[in-house]
Amino acid sequence: MASLRDIKAKINSTKKTSQITKAMEMVSASKLNRAEQNAKSFVPYMEKIQEVVASIAQGSKGINHPMLTARPVKRTGYIVITSDRGLAGGYNSNVLREVSKVIRERHNMDPNQYSIIVLGRLGRDYLKRRGFNIIDEVVGLSDHPSFTDIKDLASRAIAMFADGAYDELYIYYNHYVSKISQEVTENKVLPLTDVKSDKKLTPYEFEPSEEEILKVLLPQYAESLVYGALLDGKASEHAARMTAMKSATDNAMEVIDTLTLSFNRARQAAITQEITEIVGGAAALE
């Protein structure tokens, strides 16, 4: 049986750990509130640009743009959103497991058939160690990234599609459902063959022309899909970390309760032993 000193040291150590996890939980909760606001505030822009693109794509005939046209798929691009830091439960492992499975099933790990653009240090390290074909990466993103932080990467990804580096582009990330639920999600970014708006389409008059508008608007729309997924993923990351730290704190409190019970029992046993020895010694002197 562990000594009273050992049990007491374990209790103190666990208390200190619980203080750390509680602080991390509170920090993550604060970051989550802001991340939720960022994601929600981006929705109106996404909906409006989607409405305009859908109005052109569905309301006009003869519109021909490479980003709207499907072509034979010889190579597929993947954007994978992960985090730079751990302690977030299954946030990273879930999306990386899904991406790994998809690439093995679709491409049999043939680097000539796929390429990966990865966001986040943990995702980069995981995929590199396992020999996946990474062609671009971004690490060190802010907890609350701006569009500027991701624009260069998104522009490169779109340019590679236009140049034929791959024939379709998907993005994988954790979609934020609630504080306790996040879902691994696959969205097709390019080509934009299924652009639809949930709202009733408003008729627009375009100047100088629909084709010229699309040249500017389609890359912006594709970039906004990437940025929207990043904001969604950041909210999921903070929610997952908050939940993980709450679970760790709760587990620590259970351990403390168990250790305290063991400490009290050991202390009671020690006192009983001392009393027995004193009584026995007194009886021997009589």
Curated annotation (Swiss-Prot):
Produces ATP from ADP in the presence of a proton gradient across the membrane. The gamma chain is believed to be important in regulating ATPase activity and the flow of protons through the CF(0) complex. It is found in: Cell membrane. PROSITE patterns: ATPASE_GAMMA (PS00153). GO terms for biological process: proton motive force-driven plasma membrane ATP synthesis. GO terms for cellular component: plasma membrane; proton-transporting ATP synthase complex. One of its GO terms (molecular function) is proton-transporting ATP synthase activity, rotational mechanism. InterPro entries: ATP_synth_F1_ATPase_gsu, ATP_synth_F1_gsu, ATP_synth_F1_gsu_CS. It is a peripheral membrane protein. This is ATP synthase gamma chain. Keywords: ATP synthesis, Cell membrane, CF(1), Hydrogen ion transport, Ion transport, Membrane, Transport. Belongs to the ATPase gamma chain family. Gene3D superfamilies: 3.40.1380.10, ATP synthase, gamma subunit, helix hairpin domain. F-type ATPases have 2 components, CF(1) - the catalytic core - and CF(0) - the membrane proton channel. CF(1) has five subunits: alpha(3), beta(3), gamma(1), delta(1), epsilon(1). CF(0) has three main subunits: a, b and c. The lineage of its organism: Bacteria, Bacillati, Bacillota, Bacilli, Bacillales.
